[in-house]
Amino acid sequence: MATIRQRIAGRSLTPGAKLPSVRGLAATLKVSTSTVVDAYERLVAEGAIHSRPGSGFYVASETTPLSLIDVGQRLDRAIDPFWISRQSLDAAHDDLKPGCGWLPSSWLPVDGLRKALRTIARAGEPALADYGSPLGLPLLRQLIARRMADRGIEATPDQVMLTESGTQAIDLICRMLLEPGDTVLVDDPCYFNFQALLRAHRARMVSVPFTPTGPDIELLRKALAEHRPRLYITNSGIHNPTGATLSPVVAHRVLKLADEFGLTIIEDDIFADFEQSPAPRLGAFDGLDRVIHIGSFSKTLSASVRCGFIAARSDWIEGLTDLKIATSFGGGRLAAELVFAVLSDGGYRKHLEALRLRLSAARRDVGAKLKVLGIEPWLEPQAGLFLWCRLPGGLDAADVARAALARNVVLAPGNAFSLAQSASSFLRFNVSQTTDERVFDVLQEALKDAKGQN
């Protein structure tokens, strides 16, 4: 497959050229015909070639720029991940965003950030002007390794690589482990940007229903046996969007299945610092064998400070480091220095303690107000930002979201998180962004509008 791709890129195979027959190429390469068929199908999924029934495989015509909107199922804009992300990011400062995934700036340790910036400004020039090392700032990697150990995950600093964000961490892993057309498992529901990112990698997605204690184990086994996926992306600490946490029993069963089917798991742990006490981590039970653990500081520190990390086996870190150099060279040293300065200060621990209490109160208060409107939380989360809620009377969340957006309130409809499109009556609420009474006034009006459409 690599040879054919290189010949297409080098124009020794031109657009429209017919490829060798399956049997002919198998004989030339001394491989099975099924191996050639699989390779051709991957190239078809990639868009490099196409098949003509009864005629064979041909090099595709000149490629057009990739439009992620056109990759996969076409969705109503109200539940399209890109549309929701743009609405949240482009919203005016005074717009209400109960559907977004981050804390209000007033809930973040801004004073600690200012203090850290002053400290860095007084430091030597390298912190302000130099590239970071390929793995990232050693002091921060040492600190991350110690923090992971508190959650039961054993990793040396050399098994930790800094990234620009949690999203970049997943992107690099996908670049290393996936070929176009590979199958990836996701939870249903799951964080909608997982779907967007996997579209960019032209992966085939299969979803597994998520329960209050983790993925449905029987359906996970069925999906593994039927689809033989390369990866499974999930949250174990605090699940997005449901707020659920993985139970120890389910964690062990997931890892047993991963071992049986040769599955690699990406454990997205960007909400770890919201927890009062650590939930089970797949990376802790697995010892970072089949599990790749990622984290970020955007949620509790600052979305403007782009810094995340990957913790994995040493051989995988080696390959990921090469990819990082190829795609972003040395990485951002200033962000790493800033994160280290804030995390090393006792003020960050106090910030987290206060933040957890504040979120706990917000989950309680927001949940009670939503129930008055007939909007019921799916479960009562132990920690975190989110309430995953069912609308009354089977109302369509997309209709409610459109009505709310007309009143400058951005909501997150359930089917944006559901690959199977099975969450049409759900909304995800960020409790830290749902404290303004105007949200509930608009919700009440939007519910009435949606009822009128039924």
Regions found by a protein language model. Give the residues of each.
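N-terminal basic, amphipathic alpha-helical segments
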Residues: 1-119, 321, 325-331, 353, ...
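Conserved PLP-binding active-site segment of the aspartate aminotransferase-like
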Residues: 26, 31, 312, 388-394, ...
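Conserved core segment of the aminotransferase class I/II
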Residues: 113, 287-357
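Conserved core of the PLP fold type I
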Residues: 122-261, 273-288, 292, 452-453
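Conserved glycine-rich beta-strand-loop-beta hairpin in the small C-terminal domain of fold type I
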Residues: 357-367, 377-390
